[in-house]
Amino acid sequence: QQVPTLARRMLKKFRGIYAASELDHARLLELGCPAERIHSTGSIKFDVAIGERCTEEARTTLREDLGFSAGDKKVFILLGSSTWAGEEIALLEAQRTVITAGIDCRLLLVPRHAERAPELLQLLKAQDLPWYQRSTGGVVPENLGIHLADTTGELAYLSQTADLAFIGKSLAPNDGGQT
């Protein structure tokens, strides 16, 4: 119940939001996004074959596999998609703000360049939340706060777990978005 209130406040700050599907359009409406700001565009990636959406059961399993389960409790997953230097700090601050508001928020970080992992590990080591580095393999601990997906080719798959996605290179001083 708290998630929609927070999402509604955040979504009202956007001039326009582009939904990749009718399902995404409906979810944005449910979160309280003003209808006049939602534009259904379909996928704007013209060179990528879109796979099937995972079922709700598969989504739950994927969340558990990422260490983002909390039993019957609702977990809000924030995705940092194709992030660039400096954006992870903003995402960690956003996560902290949401947690302070009483919402169980987990962060899935997928940097644009996996070779930035050493830099990101230094940042994660300073956090007070349990984290995991995907490229190390092995057993993912349960009840993670942050999952660093420093792997290549998994973004579309991992994105299906998110409740809200931040797209990298969209904060100042960056200009022009992803290339």
Residue ranges and their predicted role:
Residues 7, 59, 155:
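Acidic, amphipathic alpha-helical patches
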Residues 13, 29, 79-81, 110-111, ...:
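Thr-Gly-centered strand-to-loop micro-motif
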Residues 51, 56-136:
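Conserved catalytic-core segment of nucleotide-activated headgroup transferases in glycan assembly
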